[in-house]
Amino acid sequence: MTGELIERQTPKRRITDPAEALAALERALPGLADHRRSARAALDWAVVEESLGTALPSDYKYLAEWYPTFAIGDCILVSLPEPGEEHLVHRGFQSALDVLVDAWLEPGLGLPSHPAPGGLLPWSESDEGDKFMWTTAGETPQEWFVTVAGRGGAWWHYEGGAVQFLAELCDSTLEPWGLRLFDSEVTPC
């Protein structure tokens, strides 16, 4: 897919506390809290991260510990590991990486795929084929930022974490640059 990097969007303040990021997402999606687990799930992150060859951002892990996989507005699928199925997570990430490499990455963009340093690691997608990825740059996963590959070929960066990105996309704080509008209904998957 031919694309070009448009530019970056930067949040007014990057949320680094996972609980604060999740609270922002729950405010942006009032129906999300209806699907919150009654207790924080104990996921074996060592298995997940070893299979991926990298640690993952704490906001994503915190979201997965409190919520199962869900869809926003029947548009954006937020796939999350399930307790007891951590050994299967690598398959989903690898499948998304294969699609990214085969159909999306253009040499001119200068955006490599994971596991290359600073490589892209997909974490979500829309029903129209938009890809939401981490750019794995920085000393720790907490410094990673979101890269969006729009179905129309436009690529852009959001200088915050995945959970803050979802919150600001849903509450219209950020400009959706090529992403379609969707309602805020939350559906467990």
Regions found by a protein language model. Name each.
Residues M1-E128, S184-T187:
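A surface-exposed partner-binding patch
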Residues A154-P176:
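Compact, glycine/acidic-enriched structural inserts
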Residues V47, P68, E106, E125, ...:
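Intrinsic disorder/low-complexity segments enriched in polar/charged and small flexible residues
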Residues Q142-A149:
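Short polybasic amphipathic segments
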Residues E86, G138-Q142:
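Short, solvent-exposed loop/turn segments that connect beta-strands within catalytic domains
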Residues D130-A137:
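Short, surface-exposed beta-strand/loop micro-motifs that present aromatic residues
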Residues W177, L181-E185:
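Low-complexity, Gly/Ser/Thr/Pro-rich intrinsically disordered linker/tail segments
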